[in-house]
Amino acid sequence: MWIVPASLVVVSAAEQKPEVQRLFQSGSYEQVVEAARDADPASTYLAAQALLKLNRMDGVAAEFARLKGNGPAWSLVGESGEALAANDAGRATDLARKATETDGDNPFAFYQLGLAASKAGDWGTASAAFSHAIALKADFAYAHYYGALAAQRQRQLPKAAEHFEAFLRLAPEAPERQAVQAIMRTLK
């Protein structure tokens, strides 16, 4: 029997429970938190994001802290999430960038980098990070959503429209649906 220290355990983002993402993309945030209990790190990350959307800051730090036993990249993603929740966009961006350098195949590391860079107003970095997250996990609607917002800030309206269309296709029950449809009418 082999004993592997927790700091060396690496869990792939591909091992995510698909129902957690589906619930997140439909705005069922309470159910996300329940479904992600004792789950994989990608689901735990989405639970933290759901708690942010619910403005339940007490649980956010706990969920991000749970990522720390899942390998170096997930630890950095968790630390970045904690920093972003504390409104430290610079530190959050640095930590997320390190996470992407540690595991270039983790779409949630790139998504976190996009969120942090957006908060810092670095739309070029945000757009590139969301595009990379989409390349790794094309079915993650919110990478398209925030990628569209970043593209819109850069006045790349065709790219924004493309991402918004993907978002609407992937998350037809999302709470942002009506707002996105209104934006789409102005882009056409």
Feature map (PLM): residue ranges:
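Short, charge-rich amphipathic alpha-helical segments embedded
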Residues: 37-56
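Canonical tetratricopeptide repeat
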Residues: 46, 78-79, 112, 146, ...
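Residue-level recognition of tetratricopeptide repeat
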Residues: 21, 49, 81-82, 115, ...
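Alpha-helical segment of the N-proximal tetratricopeptide repeat
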Residues: 16-35, 46, 74-88
